[in-house]
Amino acid sequence: MPTINQLIRKGRKSKGSKSNSPALNFGYNSYKKVQTNNSAPQKRGVATRVGTMTPKKPNSALRKYARVRLSNLIEVTAYIPGIGHNLQEHSVVLIRGGRVKDLPGVRYHIVRGALDTAGVEGRMQSRSKYGAKKPKK
């Protein structure tokens, strides 16, 4: 424990906050082949693997996920929200931050209705979150 004099001389260092979605904090310069510090709200990527995984206890389901290689060459696991999807390997997807509490290691969501990802069919409520168009009357 520091003395009062030590605290007067040095002071306390505040801890820097850690990002919950670190892959969105980097860009990539393909000419120089270096990472850049350009952060982005979403990033484009290519699905390298699409599958299902089981959640932590006490939940039980088959949650859909995709392994995505981003445009900054970082590979992340992203959750596919909604019922049913059309993603395959090599689909181009848009990811955003946001973890899935019962899937360890999944810190990103795929944006439905953007790029190759179709919106959820027949969805009437919370349509904007799932890329569903307004139904015709």
Curated annotation (Swiss-Prot):
Keyword Magnesium: no
CDD domains found in the cross-reference section: Ribosomal_S12
GO biological process terms held by the UniProt record: translation
A molecular function (GO) term: tRNA binding
Record GO cellular component, one term: small ribosomal subunit
Region called Disordered, residue ranges: 1-57
Keywords of the record: Methylation, Ribonucleoprotein, Ribosomal protein, RNA-binding, rRNA-binding, tRNA-binding
Protein origin, superkingdom: Bacteria
InterPro entries in alphabetical order: NA-bd_OB-fold, Ribosomal_uS12, Ribosomal_uS12_bac
Subunit structure: Part of the 30S ribosomal subunit. Contacts proteins S8 and S17. May interact with IF1 in the 30S initiation complex.
Family: Belongs to the universal ribosomal protein uS12 family.
Role summary: With S4 and S5 plays an important role in translational accuracy.
Protein's recorded name: Small ribosomal subunit protein uS12
Organism: Ligilactobacillus salivarius (strain UCC118)
The organism's taxonomic lineage, starting at the top: Bacteria, Bacillati, Bacillota, Bacilli, Lactobacillales
